[in-house]
Design a protein with these regions (language model features):
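A short, conserved structural fragment
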Residues: 101-112, 334-335, 887
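A Rossmann-like FAD-binding core segment of flavoenzymes
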Residues: 533-582, 595-612, 634-744
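Ferredoxin-type iron-sulfur electron-transfer modules and their immediate structural context
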Residues: 33-35, 56-57, 196-199, 203-320, ...
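Beta1-alpha1 glycine-rich phosphate/pyrophosphate-binding loop at the start
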Residues: 396-399, 405-406, 447-451, 487-555, ...
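Short amphipathic alpha-helical interaction segments
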Residues: 86-102
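Short, amphipathic alpha-helical interaction segments positioned at domain boundaries
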Residues: 115-154, 909
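Short acidic, hydrophobic short linear motifs in intrinsically disordered regions
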Residues: 74-86
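Glycine-rich dinucleotide-binding loop and its adjacent helix/turn
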Residues: 457-478, 504, 537-557, 581-635, ...
Length: 925
C-alpha cells in the first residue's frame, strides 16, 4: 500500500469490514479471549477483532494470553501478586512478565510506597498498540502491528467523539501549548505548562521512537520524518522504554533541544491524558499528517479530543498575511483572508465562516473530514487574500517583507523572502514582476515597486558579512539525512531544489555541464541586466548550506544515471533547461552568419564575441529577442532591427523591455515573418526577406500564423539571429530510462510532485514547462525538493499533507479604495554615464534606504490571517512563526484543562452527552 506515485491522493478509509482481515477458520481461543478482554469499544463492538486478533496472535503465546486475561486493565500487580494470581513460581512468572513487557503487551512502573516493580495491562491506546510499534525492528518483522494501531486509535471512538467534553474525558492525548506562547499568561495553571511536567519528573526522561510515525511509515503513508527520538517518556515510563529497547535516557537540556526542534518543524506538543491532572507518562511532538492522537479531533471534527485551554487570535493591524501561521497550523484553523473593506460586505471587512461543532448538532460521518490531512493545508479563504502573494509563482510573502523593510528589519525580510525564493538578488534584477501586475495599489495610482525593494533587501547576500545563510531545519534527530540526491543542471530550478534540500538536512550534489552555475541566468541573460557575481554570491550560499557542485560534468556523456545509482544516488532532479534554439525552416538559414538566440547569448556571455559590426537582424518578439537586440546594439552593430509575427499589442516582450531596446537603438517591426535569407557569392548573409503576417492565432487562441505572400519586405543584413523558440537538448541523459517525453520533447511528470514514469527521476523548470521565467523554475524546484525528500524516506507518500499552494487573490474590483490618497511610485536611478563607460555593467542602481521607506509605505496591506476559533486546538505553533507579534494565545477555554482519569470517562461522557442532547432537542446553543 505504498503511495509513492504520480497523481495519488489519499482519503482516510471508512471504518468497515473491507479493512478488517478475517479470522482464520480455527482461531486460537486464547487470543480471541484476549481481544475481548483488552478492548473497550465504547459504542463499536466488532470492527477491530481482525487486526486485534492477528496482532495479538503474533505478539503472544496462548499461555501469555491466558495470563493477560487474568489481569484487570490498568490495575498494577507486584510480582507476588502475579504469582498468586497465576499460580506460577515467581521466577517463571517474572520471566514471562518481562518477555511480554519487552514485546509491548505490558508496561511496568514503581508507583507504590515501597517502590516495588509492578506490571500493568495497559489499554490499547495509549498503551500496548503503541508499544508494539515503538521498536522499529519488531514493527518491520510484524507489520500487522501498524494497521492494528491505526485502527485501534480510530474505530472505538467513531461514535463517541461528539460526546467528548472539553478536556478530553481521559481519552488519549491532550495538546499542551508552546511554553513561550503562554509564559506571560497570568491566568494559566501549572498543568498547562511543559515546564510543570518537566519539573515533576526532573531527571527522569527518555527519548523514544514515535509510534505514529513508525506505523504510518510501515503502511506507506509516512510523512518523511525520521521516527526516532521525537517522543519523550517521563518518570517510570522513561525506565520502561529504555529497559525494553524502545528509547534512551536524555538530559533536560536534550529535552529542550527536542522541543525546540519540534517547534521549528511545526510539530505539536501533546501530553498523555488518561491519568488525571497529577500524572503523565509522555510528551509527544506530533506531525498532524501521521499522528493518530491529533486525528481523533481532525477526522471527526471534534476538537475537544485535542484542544488546550487556549485560542489563537490575530491582531489584524499587525498582521501582514505572510502565511507563516497558516503553513504551520495543524488544524487548518488559520487561513489567509483580507484586511481591506469589501463593497459586498457593506464597506466592512468581510466576515469569515466558522467550522460547525458537535456541541449542539447531530453528528455523524457526514460531518467528518476524511481528507483532513490535505484539507487542513488549504491556505486561503475562497474570497481571497493579497494578490501579490497569489500572483507570484513561488508565493513569496510580499506584504510581509515590505513591512519588515519598512521597519528597517532587513535581515528578517531577507529570511522571509528565502522561505520561498532562494535567489532574491537575481530575481530583483530579472523577475517579470507578476506581483506588481496584480498589486491592488495599481487601482489607486501605480503598483508598489515590489521588485526594487526586494533587490535592495537582497543586496545583503552580495556581502559575506551580511548574507543570510538559512539554518538547517530537519525532521530528524540525527542532524540530517544521508541519502544521496543528484541535481542535474545548475539553473534556477536546480539551484532552488538544492537550496531547499540542503535546508532540510541533505547534501545534494549538483552536476552542471558548464564551467559556471546559473544556466540561462549566466549564459542567457545579458550582464548589464544581471552581473555574474550576483549569481555566484547566491550560489555560494547554497554551497555553504551543504550542497556540492560538480562543474564540467555532462550526465549522460561523462557519467550515466545508472552509474550514479551504483554510486548510491537515490533520486535525481533533472533541470537542464532549454539550451537549444529553433530555426524557421526557410532557405538560407544554414549559412554561417545565421544563429539561434541561445547560442548567440551564450557566446556573448562567455566573452567569445566582443564586437559585432554591420547590420544585425533579429527574428522574434519575446524577451530573449530583446536581449539579443540590446546585446547587438552594445556590441557596436550599426543597425539592429527586430522582426516579429505579432502586432505591438501581441508581442510577448513586455512594454518595459521594448522601451529599453528602443532606448539602446534597436528598431522593432511588427507583423512580419521570415521568408528567405539571402546569401552573397561567398555564401555569407547579405539580406533577408519577410512576408506580412496577417494572423498569428486562430479563433481558439492556438498558434496558427497566416501570411500575405504578396506583401514582402527585403532588408539588408550581415547576420541573422533566430529567436523564435527554444529546444531541449537531452543528449544521452535519459538513455535507458522510462521517462516519457511529450510535446516539444518536454518530460512528462505528475503536475504536483514532478515525478516521472521513472520513479526516482523528477523534473522541473523549462524541461517540464517549456521556456518560462526564472521565478517559475524556482517555484518548481521548491516543490520538487518536497517530493524528493518524501521519496527517499522509506514508506512516505508524495502527496498526503502537502501544502496545497492554492492561493486565491481577492477581488480588486470589490475592495473599497476611495479613501487612499495618491502617492507617486519611486523609480530606481539609471546611471547613464556608467552605462556609456561600461555598456555591459549594471547601470540601474538599487533603491536608497529613503526610497525603500517611501515605497513600502505605499503598500495597502491587503491581506490578513484569519483564525477560526472553532478549529483552533491552542498549540501555539503559530506564535513561534510570526515575525510581527500579530498572533497570540488567549485562555478562552479554561474548561479544556480539565484532566480526568480514564476510569472516569463514562461519567464524563454521560454528563456532557446529556447537556448536548438537550441542546440538540431544544435547539439551544
Amino acid at each position: 500500500m505504498i503511495l509513492n506515485g504520480p497523481g495519488i491522493s489519499y482519503t482516510e478509509p471508512d471504518i468497515g469490514s473491507e479493512f478488517v482481515p478475517p479470522l482464520p477458520e480455527h482461531p486460537r481461543e486464547a487470543i480471541v479471549k484476549l481481544c475481548e478482554h483488552c478492548t473497550n469499544r465504547l459504542l463499536h463492538r466488532d470492527e477491530l477483532l481482525g487486526y486485534e486478533y492477528w496482532s495479538f496472535a503474533e505478539a503472544a503465546t496462548d499461555e501469555q494470553a491466558e495470563v493477560l486475561c487474568k489481569m484487570k486493565m490498568r490495575r498494577p500487580y507486584t510480582l507476588p501478586e502475579m504469582a498468586k494470581l497465576t499460580g506460577m513460581p515467581e521466577a517463571d512468572i517474572e520471566k514471562m512478565l518481562d518477555d511480554m513487557s519487552y514485546t509491548g503487551l505490558l508496561e511496568y512502573n514503581w508507583e507504590n510506597p515501597e517502590r516495588a516493580k509492578q506490571w500493568v495491562l495497559p489499554m490499547l491506546v495509549p498503551g500496548s498498540a503503541e508499544f508494539l510499534n515503538m521498536r522499529v525492528s519488531q514493527l518491520e518483522e510484524h507489520p500487522v502491528y501498524a494497521k492494528f494501531f491505526e485502527q485501534a486509535s480510530k474505530g472505538p471512538l467513531s461514535k463517541a467523539t461528539p460526546m467528548v467534553p472539553p478536556g478530553g474525558a481521559g481519552i488519549g492525548m491532550h495538546v499542551i501549548p508552546v511554553e513561550k506562547a503562554i509564559d506571560a499568561s497570568s491566568t494559566s495553571v501549572p498543568i498547562e505548562h511543559i515546564e510543570h511536567w518537566l519539573d515533576k519528573y526532573d531527571g527522569k526522561y527518555a527519548a523514544s521512537t514515535c509510534s505514529c510515525r513508525a506505523s504510518r511509515r510501515v503502511m506507506g503513508e509516512g510523512c518523511a520524518d525520521d521516527p526516532a527520538d521525537w517522543c519523550i517518556a517521563v518518570g517510570d515510563m522513561a525506565d520502561y522504554v529504555v529497559e525494553t529497547d524502545r528509547g534512551h535516557y536524555v538530559t533536560r537540556d536534550e529535552v529542550y533541544d527536542i522541543l525546540r526542534q519540534a517547534e521549528d518543524n511545526g510539530f505539536v506538543h501533546q501530553i498523555t491524558n488518561i491519568d488525571g491532572e497529577n500524572k503523565i507518562f509522555g510528551i509527544c511532538n506530533c506531525n498532524v499528517n501521521v499522528c493518530y492522537a491529533l486525528r481523533t479531533s481532525q477526522l471527526f471534527n471534534t476538537p475537544n479530543l485535542s484542544r488546550s485551554a487556549y485560542v489563537a487570535k490575530v491582531e489584524k493591524d499587525k498582521c501582514v498575511a505572510c502565511g507563516r501561521c497558516v503553513e504551520v497550523c495543524p488544524a487548518g484553523a488559520a487561513k489567509l483572508g483580507q484586511k481591506l473593506c469589501s463593497k459586498k460586505a457593506g464597506g466592512q471587512v468581510p466576515e469569515y465562516p466558522r467550522q460547525e461543532l458537535p456541541d449542539a448538532t447531530k453528528w455523524d460521518h457526514t460531518k467528518w473530514s476524511p481528507n483532513y490531512r490535505n484539507d487542513n493545508r488549504i491556505e486561503t479563504h475562497e474570497s481571497g487574500t493579497a494578490p501579490c502573494k497569489t500572483a507570484c509563482p513561488a508565493h513569496v510573502a510580499v506584504q510581509g517583507y515590505l513591512k519588515l523593510a519598512a521597519q528597517g528589519r532587513y535581515d528578517e525580510a531577507l529570511a522571509l523572502i528565502k522561505r520561498e525564493n532562494p535567489l532574491p538578488a537575481i530575481c530583483g534584477r530579472v523577475c517579470n514582476r507578476r506581483c506588481e501586475d496584480a498589486c491592488t495599489r495599481g487601482r489607486v495610482d501605480a503598483a508598489v515597486a515590489i521588485d526594487e525593494v526586494k533587490k535592495f533587501i537582497a543586496q545583503r547576500d552580495l556581502d559575506a558579512a551580511t548574507r543570510y545563510v538559512p539554518p538547517v531545519v530537519t525532521p530528524t534527530r540525527a542532524g540530517g539525512f544521508d541519502q544521496k540526491i543528484a541535481i542535474i543542471g545548475a539553473g534556477p530550478a536546480g539551484l532552488s531544489c538544492a537550496f531547499y534540500l540542503a535546508e532540510k538536512g541533505y547534501k545534494p550534489v549538483v552536476f552542471e555541464k558548464n564551467e559556471r552555475p546559473g544556466g540561462m541566468l549566466t549564459y542567457g541573460i545579458p550582464s548589464f541586466k544581471l552581473q555574474k557575481d550576483v549569481i555566484e554570491a547566491e550560489v555560494e550560499i547554497i554551497r555553504l548550506m551543504g550542497a556540492e557542485f560538480r562543474y564540467g560534468v555532462e550526465v549522460g556523456r561523462d557519467v550515466t544515471l545508472d552509474e550514479l545509482r551504483e554510486q548510491g544516488f537515490k533520486a535525481f532532479y533533472v533541470a537542464i533547461g532549454c539550451q537549444g534554439g529553433r530555426l524557421a525552416g526557410i532557405p538560407g538559414e544554414d549559412a554561417e552568419d545565421v544563429t539561434v538566440a541561445v547560442d548567440f547569448l551564450r557566446e556573448v556571455n562567455s566573452g567569445k564575441i566582443d564586437a559585432l559590426p554591420g547590420r544585425t537582424i533579429v527574428v522574434g518578439g519575446g524577451n530573449v529577442a530583446i536581449d539579443v537586440a540590446r546585446n547587438a546594439c552594445r556590441l557596436g552593430s550599426e543597425h539592429v532591427e527586430m522582426f516579429c509575427l505579432e502586432s505591438e499589442a501581441q508581442m510577448p516582450a513586455s512594454e518595459e523591455e521594448r522601451r529599453e531596446a528602443v532606448e539602446d537603438g534597436a528598431h522593432i517591426s511588427c507583423g512580419w515573418g521570415p521568408k528567405e535569407i539571402h546569401l552573397d557569392e561567398a555564401g555569407r548573409v547579405c539580406g533577408i526577406t519577410f512576408k506580412r503576417c496577417t494572423r498569428v492565432f486562430d479563433d481558439e487562441g492556438r498558434f496558427a500564423p497566416e501570411y500575405d505572400e504578396n506583401d514582402l519586405r527585403r532588408v539588408d543584413a550581415d547576420r541573422v539571429v533566430m529567436s523564435i523558440g527554444q529546444s531541449i537538448v537531452w543528449g544521452d541523459l535519459l538513455a535507458g530510462s522510462k521517462v516519457e517525453l511529450g510535446r516539444g520533447q518536454g518530460a512528462l511528470a505528475d503536475p504536483q510532485t514532478y515525478q516521472t514514469a521513472e520513479p526516482d527521476i523528477f523534473v522541473g523548470g523549462d524541461v517540464y514547462t517549456g521556456p518560462s521565467f526564472a521565478i517559475d523554475a524556482i517555484a518548481a524546484g521548491h516543490e520538487a525538493a518536497v517530493s524528493i525528500h518524501r521519496f527517499v524516506q522509506p514508506g512516505s507518500t508524495l502527496t498526503i499533507g502537502r501544502n496545497q499552494r492554492r492561493y486565491i487573490a481577492l477581488d480588486r474590483d470589490d475592495v473599497v479604495l476611495e479613501s487612499y490618497d495618491n502617492a507617486s511610485r519611486e523609480v530606481a536611478h539609471v546611471d547613464r554615464e556608467r552605462e556609456k563607460a561600461a555598456p555591459f555593467s549594471e547601470y540601474v542602481e538599487t533603491f536608497t534606504e529613503e526610497q525603500v521607506r517611501a515605497e513600502t509605505a505605499r503598500c495597502l496591506g491587503c491581506g490578513a490571517s484569519i483564525v477560526d476559533p472553532n478549529k483552533c486546538i491552542g498549540c501555539g505553533l503559530c506564535t513561534t512563526k510570526c515575525a510581527f507579534d500579530a498572533i497570540h494565545l488567549d485562555r478562552d477555554r479554561p474548561e479544556c484543562s480539565t484532566m480526568v482519569k480514564y476510569e472516569q470517562k463514562l461519567p464524563s461522557l454521560g454528563k456532557y452527552a446529556l447537556k448536548r442532547a438537550i441542546k440538540i432537542k431544544f435547539g439551544r446553543k
